[in-house]
Every structure is written in C-alpha cells, then in structure tokens.
Amino acid sequence: SEMVKIEQKGYITNIFKSNLVNKDKNYDYVDASTVLGSSSKFGKGNEDKERYILDGNKVVYINNKGEEVTEAETALDVNKNFITTWRVNANDKIVLPFIVDQYFQGNYNCTIDWGDGSEKEHVGGENSTAQRPEHTYTQAGDYNISISGKCSYFVLSANAYSSTYPELLKKLIKIVSWGTVEAGGYGFGDAENLVEIAEPTKKTFIKCEDDSFAYLFAGCKNLEVIPSFLFRYVNENTTSFEGTFERCEKLTSVPEELFENAPNATNFEETFAYCKNLMTIPTNLFANNKQSNNFKKTFAGCTKLEEVPYELFDSTPNAIDFDRAFYDCYSLKTGPKIWERANASQISGNQRTYAHCNSFDKTGLSTDILNKYFK
C-alpha cells in the first residue's frame, strides 16, 4: 500500500494509506479536543504525539506509535463557527471587536451564541445599527463565544478598541475554531493571555484582503505554541508577515512548515522580534519563500538564541535587507554569513545584522565585515 505522512505539531508518522477512510482525499488535521471533547474514548486529544485527522464527519485517530488507526463519527461541525474563549469575572461585560463604520451592514450578518445559555443574538445585515455586540456575564468562568454567519472583521486594534477596552485584551484566552465566517481581516495583537490558537481545518482561514498578516498575534506574550499549519490555507498572494509574532515572549520554537504555503511572501520584518525565549529556528523556515527581500529585525531581541542555521536564508536569493536581523541577540554564537551570499554586493549600507551579538564567533572576519554587520 502507498504510505502517507500524517503531520501535526512537528511529529511525523507513516501509516498505510489503505487504512484511511478515503485514501484519495487530502486530509485535514485537527485537534481532537476541539472535535470530540475530553470525554471521548480517544482520550483528551492533547497527549503528545497522538494525532487526529478529519474526513467529513469522521475523525481518524492515529496512536502515539503510529500503529493503530481507528475512526469515530462526530456530530460536531468544527468548520462552521468562529469560536473564541473568554475568561470573565462575575458581572464582566464582553464587547466584541467588530469594526464599526459605514460598511458595517455589509461586513456582518451573524448570530452570536454567548456560551452561557442566554438567547442567541443576531448582529448586522440590512437596517442594522453599527455598534459592537456586547454581553454581561452574571457568573465567573470560561465562556466559548460562537459566531456563525458572516463576520468579516474581528480586530482588537481597530476603531480604538484596545484603548477603549484595554482590560478586555486580557480576557481572550483561546481561539478554538476559525469557522466559515467569511473572515476578511483579524487581529489579536496584545491579547496577552491568549494561550491557544486553533489549526484551520479546511480552506476557511482569514482571507486577508490586504495580503498581510502584519502584527496578527503581536504582543500575545503567553502564547507558547504556534500550530504547524496555521497558515496552511493563506491567500497565495499573501506578502507580509511583518511583526506577526512580535513580543510573543513564551515561544521557544517555531514550526518549520509555518510559511511554506506563502510562496509570494516578501516581508518578514520583525516577525519574531523580541520573542525573548525563542531558542531554536528551523533550517527550512523560509525554504518556500523565495521572493522574500526583507528580514529587517526579524529576530531582533531574541536573547536566548544561541545558534541559527547557516542555511536559514539560502532559499531567498533576492533578500537584501538584513538590517538588525539578529540585533541584541546577546547569546548568539553562530548564524548565516550574510557577507558570503551570492548577492552580497547588492546589500548596501550599515546593516548591523549582528549588532550587540556579544557572544558571536567573529574569528577571521575583516574589519569591513565587522563594521558593516556587527557595529
């Protein structure tokens, strides 16, 4: 039988394709706790190396040795609703970060389930007043707010939301499901207690009309894990990941597959800047981003980095901006030799790529190289 790879969160196991529910189909990967809940006979779905894939209304389970394949029906459509979890105190009011402008009626036509048993609320559509939906919770707890229908924008930084409701930024703790809600632009910047992001389970991820994921999760300082296939369904014209994970202070690693489906991405400025606990960067992180030209401050302030693969930028022949790419990476000992690139003559100005990298091995480097890349 043909072998197939099931990949999730960095773990790869081979199983026989003939054992799968539909061997000719491209499978979607899913966190089983989202689909099945913690009472499933499959367990909680978060044990390391246990993996699940979704095929229609069947969930296929691969055990942690890759030797057993079972399946179960699920009544839950994980792809329908956009679901976020909020942690509230008694009598807290949650206001959702909808964009309130003249296009409100066209951007929203959705039903909101506030997750506490209260009556569902319809927002948007014709004759609707442009105002952010809000709800007060009588009891403290974690509540799943589920949105179905059309919800084009959900942006914590827009319309002065973050300055008007700074305390609400701390209450968003999970993105449980991305849903099919015609998402045009989302932003979770400075949601400092966001700890979990769902993997998209089919082509329903943010459309990003401006072709940018700029600062999408910037300042999510308690986020520990980025799903491997978070950007699996991005618009292929996506060009910018500027600041996407900037100041995600608890990240220790980055999945190698993260940007592989964004072949036209050009801008990685500050993408992981000030991720002060980041310890490893995979060699092939930018392997499919051959159009990239901007790595300004990409890893600046990543003070725990000690070694960066020499080949990290080898697949990006057009890149000419490495200004402060590893600035203030005090612990960094080795990294890409920018001065040996084929296009090194096109890299102009004082790059300061490794400025303040006090641990870096500078053996044999010329004064010109030191002045250009290390001062």
Region roles according to the model:
Residues 1-35, 39:
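Conserved hydrophobic/amphipathic alpha-helical signal-anchor segments
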Residues 12, 58, 109-111:
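Conserved beta-strand and immediately adjacent loop positions that scaffold enzyme active sites
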Residues 32-46, 50-52:
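Extracytoplasmic/periplasmic/luminal assembly and interaction segments
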Residues 42, 52-53, 66, 76:
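Intrinsically disordered, low-structural-confidence terminal and linker regions
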Residues 45, 54-55, 63, 114:
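Acidic surface patches and DE-rich sequence motifs
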Residues 47-48, 54-56, 104-108:
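A short, compositionally biased
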Residues 53, 59-63, 68-70:
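Short linear proline/tyrosine/threonine-rich motifs used for host-factor recruitment
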Residues 66-375:
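Negatively charged
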